[in-house]
From Swiss-Prot:
Its EC number is 3.6.4.13. Keywords: ATP-binding, Coiled coil, Helicase, Hydrolase, Nucleotide-binding, Nucleus, Phosphoprotein, Ribosome biogenesis, RNA-binding, rRNA processing. One of its GO terms (molecular function) is ATP hydrolysis activity. Disruption phenotype: Leads to improper processing of 35S precursor rRNA. SUPFAM superfamilies: P-loop containing nucleoside triphosphate hydrolases. SMART domains: DEXDc (SM00487), HELICc (SM00490). This is ATP-dependent rRNA helicase RRP3. It is found in: Nucleus. ATP-dependent rRNA helicase required for pre-ribosomal RNA processing. Involved in the maturation of the 35S-pre-rRNA and to its cleavage to mature 18S rRNA. Pfam families: DEAD, Helicase_C. The gene is RRP3. Interacts with the SSU processome. Residues 112-284 form the Helicase ATP-binding domain.
C-alpha cells in the first residue's frame, strides 16, 4: 500500500511541476510580447507623452475641485509647480527633491499654504492623493524653528498606517534631525515607554495605545503639544475609536494647538468630531464623493462556480512580472491563496489579522522590497498603506460595501501613476457589483478570458489547492494540540499551587 501511495504522490508532484513549467513558458512568451510591443511603440513615446501632458492640462482646467470652507475661511484654488514656491525651509525643499516629489499634489497645493499660515485644516481627498505629506510638511516647517519635544502627535487607525506615516516623517525630516516614534498596540509597552522618554519631536500612534501611555507612563505628557493630526478620521470613527478620541481631546491642550483632520469622506460623525476639536478650520476638498482616479482601469471577470482559483492563476500568468495585491474577505482565504501561489511558483506573501505585528511588517517589507511580487491580504491592508508601485489589484472576494471597494482599488494608480483592478464576479456577487457600479456611476467592462487555457489549468490548480488545504489543516491540528498541551501544563501547575496552600 505504501508503494501505491508513493506512486500517487510522485504522479501528483510531477503534474504540479508540469503545471509550473507551463506557466513559466507562458510567462516568458508574455514577456517577449511586452518587450516587442515596447520596442515598436518606442518611437512614438515622445509624441504620446506630449499629447498625454496636453490632455492632462485640459482635464485639469475642466475638473478643478471647488474648495469649500468652514466658517467662511477659504484658500485659493491654485496649483504649484514646485515645492520651492511654498516658501518652505531649504532642508524640506531638498528632502522633497531627494524623494522625487516633483510638484505638490492637489491636496498638498490646497492644504499646505493655509496650514503654513497657522490655520486648522480639514483635508478631504481620495486615497493615494498625498495626504500624509500634506500635513507632515507644514508641521516639519514649523518644527525647524521651534525644535521642541512632543511637538506633534498623529493619530492613525491601524498599526500599518502609523508605521508608514513615521516613515514619511523620517524621510521628509532626514536633513533636519527629526526624532519620531511609533506607538501602537501589539508591541512592548516598556520599549515604547523608553522611546517616549527620549523626548521625540513627533509621535505617531493608534488611539488606544496612546491613551495607555498617557495614563500609565510616568513622565509622559502632551501638555505642550503644538500639533494634533487625526489621519483617516472616518476610519478612526468606523473602528469605534470615538470614546478614546474624546478622552484624548480632554487631556491635551486646546490653547496654542493646531489641529488637522484628514479623511476620505465627510460624514455626520466627522462633522461632529471637527466641531469638538478644530477652531475655524479651512476645509480643503479635492473630492467630496466616493470616486476613483482617472488613471485606474477597472474591469470585472465573470467566474463560473468552482473555478475562482483557476481564474486567479490564469490572471497571475497573464500579468506575470507585475506587482499585485489580491484581496480576500477572510484570513483563511488569504493564507490559502498565498500558499497556492507559492506552490505554483508565484512569489507571494500574506497579510491578515492573525499575524502579529512583526509578521505583518515582515510581509509588507518583502512586498515593498520586491522580494515578493504578490501580496494576498484582507481589508487590513486596504486603508492607508503607501505602496507606490502596485500595478494590479484583484478582488478575489467582492467586498460587501462599496466604500471598501473604493479603498481596495485605491492601492493602485496612486499619485498620478496608472493601474488596473480586476474583480472576480460569481453568480452570488451580482448584487454587490451592481451597488459598486451605481456608486461609480458607470458599468465595469468585462475582462476577456481564453477558455482553453482555463480548461487546461483547472485540474492541476484544483490538485494544488487540495494540497494547500491539507497542509493548512495539518498545521491547525498541531496548533490545537500545542494549545491543549499548554492548558494541561497550566492546570497541573494550578493544582500544585492549590495543594501548596
Amino acid at each position: 500500500m505504501s508503494k501505491i501511495v508513493k506512486r500517487k504522490e510522485k504522479k501528483a508532484n510531477d503534474e504540479l511541476t508540469s503545471l509550473a513549467e507551463k506557466i513559466r513558458a507562458k510567462a516568458l512568451e508574455n514577456q517577449k510580447k511586452l518587450i516587442e510591443a515596447e520596442k515598436e511603440g518606442g518611437s512614438e513615446s515622445d509624441s504620446e507623452e506630449d499629447a498625454t501632458a496636453e490632455k492632462k492640462k485640459v482635464l485639469k482646467s475642466k475638473s478643478k475641485s471647488t474648495v469649500s470652507t468652514q466658517n467662511e475661511n477659504t484658500n485659493e484654488d491654485e496649483s504649484f509647480e514646485s515645492f520651492s514656491e511654498l516658501n518652505l525651509v531649504p532642508e524640506l525643499i531638498q528632502a522633497c527633491k531627494n524623494l522625487n516629489y516633483s510638484k505638490p499634489t492637489p491636496i498638498q497645493s490646497k492644504a499646505i499654504p493655509p496650514a503654513l499660515e497657522g490655520h486648522d485644516i480639514i483635508g478631504l481627498a481620495q486615497t493615494g492623493s498625498g495626504k500624509t505629506a500634506a500635513f507632515a510638511i507644514p508641521i516639519l516647517n514649523r518644527l525647524w524653528h521651534d525644535q521642541e519635544p512632543y511637538y506633534a502627535c498623529i493619530l492613525a487607525p491601524t498599526r500599518e498606517l502609523a508605521q508608514q506615516i513615521k516613515e514619511t516623517f523620517d524621510s521628509l525630516g532626514s536633513l533636519m534631525g527629526v526624532r519620531s516614534t511609533c506607538i501602537v498596540g501589539g508591541m512592548n509597552m516598556m520599549d515604547q515607554a523608553r522611546d517616549l522618554m527620549r523626548k521625540p519631536h513627533i509621535i505617531i500612534a493608534t488611539p488606544g495605545r496612546l491613551m495607555d501611555h498617557l495614563e500609565n507612563t510616568k513622565g509622559f505628557s502632551l501638555r505642550k503639544l503644538k500639533f494634533l493630526v487625526m489621519d483617516e478620521a472616518d476610519r478612526l470613527l468606523d473602528m469605534e475609536f470615538g470614546p478614546v478620541l474624546d478622552r484624548i481631546l480632554k487631556i491635551i491642550p486646546t490653547q496654542e494647538r493646531t489641529t488637522y483632520l484628514f479623511s476620505a469622506t465627510m460624514t455626520s460623525k466627522i462633522d461632529k468630531l471637527q466641531r469638538a476639536s478644530l477652531t475655524n478650520p479651512v476645509k480643503c476638498a479635492v473630492s467630496n464623493k466616493y470616486q476613483t482616479v482617472d488613471t485606474l482601469v477597472q474591469t470585472l471577470m465573470v467566474v463560473p462556480g468552482g473555478l475562482k482559483n483557476t481564474y486567479l492563476i490564469y490572471l497571475l500568468n497573464e500579468f506575470i512580472g507585475k506587482t499585485m495585491i489580491i484581496f480576500t474577505r477572510t484570513k483563511a482565504n488569504a493564507e490559502r491563496l498565498s500558499g497556492l501561489c507559492n506552490l505554483l511558483e508565484f512569489s507571494a506573501t500574506a497579510l491578515h489579522g492573525d499575524l502579529n505585528q512583526n509578521q505583518r511588517m515582515g510581509s509588507l517589507d518583502l512586498f515593498k522590497a520586491g522580494k515578493r511580487s504578490i501580496l494576498v491580504a484582507t481589508d487590513v491592508a486596504a486603508r492607508g498603506l503607501d505602496i507606490p508601485s502596485v500595478d494590479i489589484v484583484v478582488n478575489y472576494d467582492i467586498p460587501v460595501d462599496s466604500k471598501s471597494y473604493i479603498h481596495r482599488v485605491g492601492r493602485t494608480a496612486r499619485a498620478g501613476r496608472s493601474g488596473k483592478s480586476i474583480s472576480l464576479v460569481s453568480q452570488y456577487d451580482l448584487e454587490l457589483i451592481l451597488r459598486i457600479e451605481e456608486v461609480l456611476g458607470k458599468k465595469l467592462p468585462k475582462e476577456s478570458v481564453d477558455k482553453n487555457i482555463i480548461l487546461t489549468l483547472r485540474d492541476s490548480v484544483d490538485k494544488a489547492n487540495g494540497e494547500v488545504v491539507m497542509e493548512m489543516n495539518r498545521r491547525n491540528k498541531e496548533k490545537i494540540a500545542r494549545g491543549k498541551g499548554r492548558r494541561g501544563r497550566m492546570m497541573t501547575r494550578e493544582n500544585m499551587d492549590m495543594g501548596e496552600r
